[in-house]
Amino acid sequence: MNETTDYGASNTGANEESLRMVSSQPIGNEPASDEELRPHVLGGFIGQPRLKAQLQLFLDAARKRDVPPDHILLAGPPGLGKTTLAMIVANELEVPIRVTSGPAVQHAGDLASILSSLDTGEVLFIDEIHRLPRAAEELLYIAMEDFRVDVMVGKGPGASSIPLTLPRFTVIGATTREGMLPSPLRARFGFTAHLDFYPHDELQKLIERSANVLGVNLGDGSARELALRSRGTPRIANRLLRRVRDWAIVHDLIEVRSDDVKEALALYQIDSEGLDRLDIAVLDAIVRNFNGGPVGLNNLAAMVGEESETVETVCEPYLVREGFLIRTPKGRVATEKAWRHLGITPRDDVSKPF
């Protein structure tokens, strides 16, 4: 499988989320370092069993018909393996893959240039496809359905459009915000796959595989401790595994025990539930300063010294999903689970996690 990457302007800059150890967004050179951990065939991809079965059937049918498969949309939270699956599809089909992203395509002409250079059967992977400019989206509609692009020749009133026929290819789009895709674009995808957060047992298997690739000797219970702290996200699991590997190297450990995992990740202020310093600060402020809530977002953000957007988009989704926090019309409320996690006896009227 040949891979061509054109990310261009896809770097959105450092922010609070990208600096956290438990961020589901890539940090630093992680996209490159993740390459050694990526499986190359669908059978080696751990987790998402229903999706894998659907995708295997989809690819097998395309191979038997001897035609490029329909376009594929991979939707789900960041860090779950959308890029890896795109690479696997191209590898299974034994065709090259061209890689770009929504932010990298600044003009429709950028996308037209990529499309016009594709060969028959080639895969075009567009990460963050929901961030394509509107003009590029409209060009992509036609290319995906009719396999042609209209090239503008000349300028001003004398300009004319010349249709350029394209070879049959497959677009794989990845998005963390499927709802932001316009309906005409969604309709062009013949197969849509939704990736879910990983349960602890599947994440544990993934960590054991990654540890074997990285040469980390995990003792009994160590992979489980890592899985518990990884927020159901393979990208986070692999990142934490690397930090534990650093710990093992520095301390000359032959085997990494579960206590070593706890001690190593405590250094980064990551607790047994995968909560970090900022998560704990948010819960602590609600419980101690606002008696469990409700508290408005702006007041809460001011109390922890962060922007309101950071609290709302970086901290709250995981806290709500894991039952530590409830959003109400009156504000944020800490659940009984949050109180007990902080080691504080909850009030009698405190909400239980849903």
From Swiss-Prot:
Belongs to the RuvB family. DNA binds at R327, R332. It comes from Bifidobacterium longum subsp. infantis (strain ATCC 15697 / DSM 20088 / JCM 1222 / NCTC 11817 / S12). Its EC number is 3.6.4.-. It comes from the Bacteria. This is Holliday junction branch migration complex subunit RuvB. One of its GO terms (molecular function) is ATP hydrolysis activity. Homohexamer. Forms an RuvA(8)-RuvB(12)-Holliday junction (HJ) complex. HJ DNA is sandwiched between 2 RuvA tetramers; dsDNA enters through RuvA and exits via RuvB. An RuvB hexamer assembles on each DNA strand where it exits the tetramer. Each RuvB hexamer is contacted by two RuvA subunits (via domain III) on 2 adjacent RuvB subunits; this complex drives branch migration. In the full resolvosome a probable DNA-RuvA(4)-RuvB(12)-RuvC(2) complex forms which resolves the HJ.
